[in-house]
Amino acid sequence: MEDTKKKKKKNINNNQDSKKKERHIVTWSQEEDVILREQITLHGTENWAIIASKFKDKSTRQCRRRWYTYLNSDFKRGGWSPEEDMLLCEAQRVFGNRWTEIAKVVSGRTDNAVKNRFTTLCKKRAKHEAMTKDSNSNTKRMLFLDGISTPRKSENETPIAKKLKRSHILDLTEISNYGRAEACVNQQIRSPFSVLARNATGIDSLEEQNQTSNVNESDGEGMFLKKDDPKVTALMQQAELLSSLAQKVNADNTEQSMENAWKVLQDFLNKGKENDLFRYGIPDIDFKIEEFKDLIEDLRSGYEDNQLSWRQPDLHDSPASSEYSSGSTIMVDQSGDKTQPFSADTQTEHKQVGEELLVPKNPDENMPISGEEKFSSPIQVTPLFRSLADGIPSPQFSESERSFLLKTLGIESSSPCPSANPSKPPPCKRVLLHSL
């Protein structure tokens, strides 16, 4: 077996040596170059067989290469320009490896030069791609190694450094995801319950509130009506009148009481139209007597349905709500430091009773406050008529007495009663309103 292998190796080496010996280097003398130029001028560059027959040991291929490579002065020698490289690549894409046809397209270059240049370009391209692959793999490897080594470094860091690094990462995420991060923050931050919609009378009133208010909207706080705002006065008077008339009609349950209540309401509305104070009132107040009857029925049904729930004790009574059920001569201010007599706050008490009537529609909208203070949080409110006792008798009043009492209580006139004595206990306003 070993002998056969040795023999095969010897035969291969002998064949290679024979091929090397057969390889003949073609040399051209000056006489042969002169003969080649003369034959080309006679026969041109198309009849290489006739030209090669004039030589003893030259083939057609050797003659053609000698002419195009060394003797022809029209062909370029030296480096290739980028334009020639682009033209060569496009021609090779069209003609393939037909170098003679490609040489006709690339002017000034022989077929052999075109072939050699294309192989050189292919080698450069392959080398460049190999280098880019190696560089990409190296960068990926470095990133992978860095990703593995970073936790080891973070273990040795102090907690302060870790917090700084985490905050830095959060900043980067906020910069990259600016819109989404801001949207998420806006969704998470919840506005307090005290921020209420300002729905007074439209755009004009909103602009007036924005100009006269001292509250800065940039702080995220809501804007509310002041205690002495004319809108509050108008709404309170309307609410008190409607409630008192409905209770009176409900108590009498006669057509005469309905007509009297309707007359009082018409007089009040006519005065309200003439007075600028009531321009903030209810916009659709011009209703008919049938609608007034429906309103009374609604108030009657609502009062009967909610009477039991209003009598239930409230576990979270606020100091402001406890003032409604008290009959003392002194009203406690919310600040807890000052007391005032009742006669000085008659109009304030009217507004508080009206606010109590409006609470079931929007409990957070209008709450009694002191001075120029504005609402900052929702307050627990005692339900309507919770403090009324069933045993209080309902006195009977004539028409003149009833109108006098209405004027005294400030329903037709916003000024307090001048004859009120601050040293005496106040009249039972709730009983009077209930009876009216």
Swiss-Prot record:
Subcellular location: Nucleus
DNA-binding region residue numbers: 48-71, 99-122
Cystines in this chain: none
Induction, as annotated: Strongly induced by auxin in a IAA14/SLR1 and ARF7 dependent manner, especially in xylem pole pericycle cells, lateral roots initiating cells.
Tissue/organ expression: Expressed in all shoot organs with higher levels in leaves, stems, flowers, siliques and floral buds. Also detected in roots tips.
Motif mapping: Nuclear localization signal 2: 151-158
Region Disordered, residue ranges: 1-23, 309-328
Sequence ranges of Polar residues compositional bias: 319-328
Free-text function comment from the UniProt entry: Transcription factor that binds to DNA in promoters cis-regulatory element 5'-GGCGCGC-3' of cell cycle genes, including cyclins, cyclin-dependent kinases (CDKs), and components of the pre-replication complex. Binds to DNA in promoters cis-regulatory element 5'-AGCCG-3' of auxin regulated genes (e.g. PIN3 and PIN7). Together with FAMA and MYB88, ensures that stomata contain just two guard cells (GCs) by enforcing a single symmetric precursor cell division before stomatal maturity.
Subunit structure: Interacts with RBR1.
Protein name, UniProt field: Transcription factor MYB124
Organism: Arabidopsis thaliana (Mouse-ear cress)
Gene giving rise to this polypeptide: MYB124
